[in-house]
């Protein structure tokens, strides 16, 4: 009996654990501290800084099953998903890694043992082929002489992409940096499937499938293209779980493995589909995986960046559900079946199931309202299309009006062998793209891309002043030896009391001072293991190696500490009041305010806000000690410490406890006791996205300032009402009641005036072939009274056509009324449109009543004068 996908995942991890590898959990799909990546798309992403030498771990061997998404950006598989055997938006990458430990010999031997060992995957050896880089004789000889693969099944692949080292078998992190040859392992499905071995003209067939890529990082590529050997060569491998599952379960398509069969059956059940071979079932089964895990990792549907990619995937799935005949929202119902098939890999998703389902349901409901109309418009455009290309303007209109991502439109068109003018679409989208996705893209400023080889020691938990030494200087992202007065720069010290922005807490400000120089620090950021002080040299000169005195702005840091501690108290209070589904989705801890985004599906009630406030202030009054302990990550979690899912933690973590009320992992700076916070007040609660709420709050002096401001406002109102704050409610209710009474009396007077005006106007009507025509501009009449007057005049005049106008603050208001017996000849909507066009406006309505507005009051007399001729022509 073949292994299940879950068993294959576990077997891989167990194998490498038995070989001395640390089993590391999958990192978030949102890359941590890497502005160059849209989504985590490979197992090595979370170890990038380790390979670059910017991060150190307490292990030199690791193994993971990493969740990955490839959709959007460079890796965009979206249009192929569901239509090929192996394209996915979401997949799991099995990997083993060596950080300066073992190299080619062990990496190859491990792979061979796992794939062919009787106690492991037990694949037939004769079915396995390998490729090596053309000049990698070492790997070739290991495969041939040690493993025993015949030469005819070992293929050398050279520079097949048009440049030196541009090869399927040479891996590079970028234009510079770690790189090296790789060896790939292929599985031969047999001659009953078309295709040739790698490197042959038929290599794109499905007979020979790559199942494992083993990268040997042995060089450091310089800017001039030269390759320098790395002092500690490393190994990075990747094997797609879905691919190896297909091989081990003896199927040719990833969509036929047990995991996808179960999901496809679930999709068929919720959509009512009966043909399990329908490609739309595959599309939806794939898309629920990426969408559910993206939402669980904090991505929400939006019109920019990651959120836009998520929206595109959701809407593509919904449209395929529509094709299958789904009559109601269905997509969110697949989260449960997904959790079941993921097993232990779906535990975090299970904890957030309700939140994920709500986000997906809300997005589907929003799109469903326009999907049918949008598809109808697209069908109409395609039906009258001359040629085989849909114009970009129509594609843009579908996006702008109906929320159709262009790739969804392209999907529909592809099914009819029609192309989309994407260049025209991009031209029409230029303004929106600049305002949304491009404007807020991932370029980051130059500071984010600085690479610092040195490390800084943070001593700011215990010190706000410290002597240190300059180890690096950067100007415009480039390393320099010295800076002069007036220059902006990033200064790196060997040790510093300045806290670098992290975990939502803003970076410190202050000064670096020394012999004849002063550097004003405006921000502090992390660069790998270094801490950079961003600012401007206000006096003197500063060079690498100089001694400095680092002084943190003490008052500002103190306010930040209070706000950070209050954030922890509020997080715990929210979970008590609203439920344990509350999870942090983002935060800002500054010296002025604390902002906290959290998962919750509805606006908080005033009573809930008050309860959270009261709970936090109760803990402040308890004056609990705020204690920190350093311990192993597993021990901290066992103690109940809350960890932020997707946050990157070291093996040793800092646990912050506030009595028995709150325990969290946190590297930030905090008060000594909860009583230091003084007072906590929530100043706003709002929604930021589906299923996400935001609270802003203040503490200490800031909280007292809000109390004083509120008291001052109450006193001002009491003074205006000639009362005091004690009976203010009664006073306001009395004023409101009196106001309502006066407004009622005023309306009665206006109605009487309008009725009188209508009576006066009726005598001005002229007869046109038995129809009374009345056209008049009225002064001093509110626009909303015109409708009442038209109704009165229609009752008085019988067969009639009426046009009334008034001008208020330069804006023209128009109304046309036509008695029902005349609407077969004169339509009020057409009439009002003719008049409105002349005064710079537009309008519309029913055949018997229509309204309009305009901006050109000077043109009104001429416009009204044209009515009689227009109506006369219609009545003839």
UniProtKB/Swiss-Prot annotation:
- Family label: Belongs to the class-II aminoacyl-tRNA synthetase family.
UniProt enzyme class = ligase
Protein name as it appears in the record: Alanine--tRNA ligase
Among InterPro entries, the record links this protein to: aa-tRNA-synth_II/BPL/LPL (IPR045864), Ala-tRNA-lgiase_IIc (IPR002318), Ala-tRNA-ligase_IIc_anticod-bd (IPR018162), Ala-tRNA-synth_IIc_core (IPR018165), Ala-tRNA-synth_IIc_N (IPR018164), Ala-tRNA_ligase (IPR050058), Ala_tRNA_ligase_euk/bac (IPR023033), DHHA1_dom (IPR003156)
Per its UniProt record, what Gene3D superfamilies does this chain match?
A: 2.40.30.130, 3.10.310.40, 3.30.54.20, 6.10.250.550, Bira Bifunctional Protein, Domain 2, Threonyl-trna Synthetase, Chain A, domain 2
Q: Which PROSITE patterns match?
A: AA_TRNA_LIGASE_II_ALA
UniProt keyword Transmembrane, yes or no: no
> A single GO CC term, please?
cytosol
Q: Name one Pfam family in it.
A: DHHA1
Q: How does it assemble?
A: Homotetramer.
Where is this chain's protein located in or outside the cell?
A: Cytoplasm
What biological function has been recorded for the protein in this entry? Catalyzes the attachment of alanine to tRNA(Ala) in a two-step reaction: alanine is first activated by ATP to form Ala-AMP and then transferred to the acceptor end of tRNA(Ala). Also edits incorrectly charged Ser-tRNA(Ala) and Gly-tRNA(Ala) via its editing domain.
Q: What is written in the cofactor note of this entry?
A: Binds 1 zinc ion per subunit.
Q: What is its EC number?
A: 6.1.1.7
Which GO biological process annotations does it have? alanyl-tRNA aminoacylation; negative regulation of DNA-templated transcription
Q: Which NCBIfam families match?
A: alaS
What keywords are assigned to this protein?
Aminoacyl-tRNA synthetase, ATP-binding, Cytoplasm, Ligase, Metal-binding, Nucleotide-binding, Protein biosynthesis, RNA-binding, tRNA-binding, Zinc
The GO molecular function terms of this record are: alanine-tRNA ligase activity; aminoacyl-tRNA deacylase activity; ATP binding; tRNA binding; zinc ion binding
